[in-house]
C-alpha cells in the first residue's frame, strides 16, 4: 500500500468521472485519509461513460486518468478475473468491482449504485 493510509476504498466507475467528486476523492487520498484504488476495467468503464456523456472531452480523458494514477500511487488493482464468475450481485456487470475490492483488500466500495452491492453479501468479504 502506498502512503500511510490504513483504510482502503475501491472506487466504482460512477465516482471516477464527475469532476467535483473525483477531485475531492483524489485530494483526500493525497492526504492519506484513505487509499483510493480501482482497476483498469473500472477506469475503462468510467472513461467510456464520460465520453458518452461529454463527447467534447474525449481527447482529454486519457490525460485525466493518467494524472489520477500519478496522484495516487499503487491505485490500480489487477489479478482478480478468477473471482468474477464466483460472485453474485444483482447487476452481474458489477462483479468486477467487487472482485477488485476483494483482491485489493478494500474496506469499502465507493459508488452511487448502492443497490447493486447488497450490504449483507458484500460484508461477508469484509467490505462495507
Q: What do the PLM-derived regions correspond to, one by one?
A:
Residues 111:
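Short beta-strand and adjacent tight-turn residues that come in two discontinuous sequence segments
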Amino acid at each position: 500500500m502506498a502512503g500511510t493510509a490504513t483504510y482502503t476504498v475501491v472506487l466504482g466507475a460512477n465516482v471516477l468521472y464527475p469532476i467535483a467528486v473525483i477531485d475531492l476523492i483524489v485530494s483526500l487520498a493525497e492526504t492519506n485519509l484513505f487509499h483510493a484504488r480501482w482497476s483498469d476495467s473500472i477506469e475503462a468503464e468510467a472513461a467510456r461513460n464520460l465520453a458518452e456523456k461529454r463527447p467534447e472531452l474525449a481527447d482529454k480523458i486519457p490525460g485525466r486518468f493518467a494524472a489520477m494514477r500519478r496522484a495516487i500511487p499503487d491505485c490500480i488493482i489487477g489479478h482478480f478475473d478468477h473471482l468474477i464468475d464466483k460472485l453474485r450481485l444483482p447487476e452481474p456487470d458489477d462483479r468486477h468491482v467487487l472482485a477488485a475490492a476483494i483482491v485489493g483488500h478494500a474496506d469499502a466500495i465507493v459508488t452511487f449504485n448502492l443497490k447493486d452491492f447488497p450490504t449483507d453479501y458484500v460484508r461477508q468479504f469484509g467490505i462495507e
